[in-house]
Amino acid sequence: MAAALICGATVFTACSSNEDNNTSQGGTAQIIGRWTADVTGATETLWGDGKALRMTELSSDGTGSTDIYYLLNEDIAVGRSHQTFRYTASADGQLTMTIDGNKATETATWSMTDGRLTLQTNGQSLTLQKTDAVTEKRIIEWNAEGDLISVPAPARYTVFVYGNAGGTMDEIIEYGLWERLKPLLTDESNVRVICFYKYGKDLPQKPFTGKFTDPGDILWFELNSQTDFSKLKTAGLQSLGFKQEAQDMKLCDPATLRMFMRYSSLFCPAKNYVFTIWGHGNGFSAITDVPGKYYTSETSTTRGVIGDEWNEDEQLDMYELSYAIRSLSQRPFDNIYFHNCLMGNLETLTELRNVTEYITCSAHTLCSNGEILTEYIRGLMEKGNTPEAVDLMFKRTDDVWKPLYLEESILENSAPYNGDMKLLRTDRIDPILEATKRLAERLVAQYPTQQEAIDRATTSVYRFFTHPFIYFQQAMFDLADYAHKVANETGDAEFAAIATDIDAAFSNAFVRYEDVNWNTEQFLPHYTLSVCLFDHETYHIDIMNRFKGLNPLCNINDGYEQTTFHQMTGWGKWLDTNQKNPRGNPTSGGGKLLTR
């Protein structure tokens, strides 16, 4: 089933040569032979929860090969990488290998202890033992199967594009990302892109617009210069006879996400991984934020990354995303790129700070036709690192991306929308949390004597998005703006010091950012990240009984106090203390309508 799901993928071929006309002199007799080691979790794939077995053969004529077998259940091989080389070895423990194909040279030291061969290079060591008869038999059987995934040499980057945006928006990923990127992806050793996309429902009011396949179908393919879009449909799950399975497959299930990343990494392994979400983001929602949706032993979920309209808009949560990455890789991803709305909230980002080095996100609703993600990936190809790629992304899209917010305002007959997009380093989030903890503690301590001033700040802080009907949904407010509003209204020196520290922490964490300000009445000169803000009554409202139509899993306070963000900052204690409902605040899309 997994092999069938790699629909539309380019046929992968081994990235090494099998030239056998080697004349290099081999090493000492001690190291000649076939050697085996368990390298589970130490490869450049995301096969961390499966076994990986390495077999290296060193021949007496100075030639050698290394195969890595990727296994299920210890004895079922799924994929194999193959590399051949020439080598020289000296009696004093020096080993030099020249890789066939790319001619790269690797050096190591070798030693023998109790019949085991240890190789050391770049501060890392690997101990191999002579391949026994049982393993030899298994390897022969695995190679005879003939349908193993051929795992190529790792690229510099593999970018995962995972999503579902709905039938009215499917065309955006088609022309806004796939068609734009296709001619650029020519070098498999540099950046590879692999997509998993579920097409939306055919809405009667807005006919289905997808041109590559049918509603509910799932496409799983590598995007490169050779991708034939006309053949995607024939490789989709529905065309393969799995129509109901495609519609029932939940994007929100971490098992689906893990399967996608796990098998994709065999076809497109990389030294660095980027995970991009393409879809609708709901930010953080405390009423659907409870532990144990799929894994009952785990805690701290933050829901709202991406929904699946074929499954009652069920949401993937941030813990499940974190779990999927941690279960597959011992090293963090390079970047998580949220190409969706409202994901620049601290409740969410706190959960992800240990599974990725960078996060790209917007605290506002995001306006994009795919140009920003396209240019980010193009920047990776040219610069080879995320910060410079994001810098190029902004430079190349500034005159196209920012006007989209104004166009959206006109289409919706709204006051002008604001926006933002930022890249932050996750290892610099903790100072933000530490300053937020001080702010929460100071708010609780000073509220009895300075309630009126703090209430003024609460009702004037900038809100990133205001739900048209339900005031406590997406109640996300700019943290730095709140700290400064409180300091200004109270005149308190400690609040002022905290606001200064929050500014410094954000400045240190943000590697690159752009703000979009079309609204000249309700805006901030610079946007940071959001936090939830409720009054005591709302924080404890009986949502389970009073708002059943929202399908809540818990009340706000129950969900909020299970987040890592609350556990590190105590922010929920302030929400429990605050008596002022922040309604009517300055917001994106607030104020006077555009002049036509």
Model-predicted segments: where are they?
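Sec-dependent N-terminal signal peptides
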Residues: 1-6
